[in-house]
Amino acid sequence: MICGIDEAGRGPVVGPMVIAAVAGDGERLLQLGVRDSKTLSPTKREVIYARIIEVADCVNYVVVEPHIIDEYVRRRMLNSLELDFTARLIELCPAELYYVDSPDVNSRRYGDALSFITGRRVVALHGGESVPQVAAASIVAKVIRDRLIDILKREIGDFGSGYPSDVKTIEWLRLGKIPVECVRRSWRTLRYLNT
């Protein structure tokens, strides 16, 4: 069996990052319409997500809150964060082979590190969504993160996308409208706002 692992929310200044793992038959996943989550509308992602849950042998995810991300970033170890949490997911989803979308410029180094830590066969790829299980993990991660962001928006209002390039997000940050625990304090975006 093959397991794919991918993340959603690595770049935003607001909200968590979600890393997901999906193990199962690649052909069955493709029949569901699984492909890179970025190419699917939110509605289509939700529909496919529900189907993934039904047919996959294993679906698991971890939510990495902003304060945890900040701890790693302050030590200049964002890739290590993904390595640590991906290793946890590998332990939770048994498979013969793991395909992981690599955050490291050197995907082989990243895959080798995961293999060493977990004792499992891991192949790290850039743009791993060509592997159905990775594409499915991409959808799961994106749906979970979107749901968490929607909850936050219902609580405090629409702050935009949460990305540093979003003018609305920056304005909300500048005005202090987003709760501190929801913001990645280590992001350069905040340093620029505080100068």
Curated annotation (Swiss-Prot):
Predominant subcellular localization, coarse grouping: cytoplasm
Cofactor annotation comment: Manganese or magnesium. Binds 1 divalent metal ion per monomer in the absence of substrate. May bind a second metal ion after substrate binding.
Sorted UniProt keywords: Cytoplasm, Endonuclease, Hydrolase, Manganese, Metal-binding, Nuclease
Record EC number: 3.1.26.4
Subcellular location: Cytoplasm
Signal sequence coordinates: none
Domain of life of the organism encoding this protein: Archaea
CDD domains recorded: RNase_HII_archaea_like
Gene Ontology cellular component list: cytoplasm; ribonuclease H2 complex
Record-linked InterPro entries: RNase_H2_suA, RNase_HII/HIII, RNase_HII/HIII_dom, RNase_HII_arc, RNaseH-like_sf, RNaseH_sf
Residues reported in the UniProt entry to bind a divalent metal cation: D6, E7, D101
Record GO biological process: DNA replication, removal of RNA primer; mismatch repair
Catalytic activity: Endonucleolytic cleavage to 5'-phosphomonoester
EC class (word): hydrolase
Positions of the RNase H type-2 domain: 1-195
An MF annotation (GO) of this entry: RNA binding
Cofactor(s) demanded: Mn(2+); Mg(2+)
Chain's role: Endonuclease that specifically degrades the RNA of RNA-DNA hybrids.
Family: Belongs to the RNase HII family.
Name the UniProt record assigns to this protein: Ribonuclease HII
Source organism of the structure: Pyrobaculum islandicum (strain DSM 4184 / JCM 9189 / GEO3)
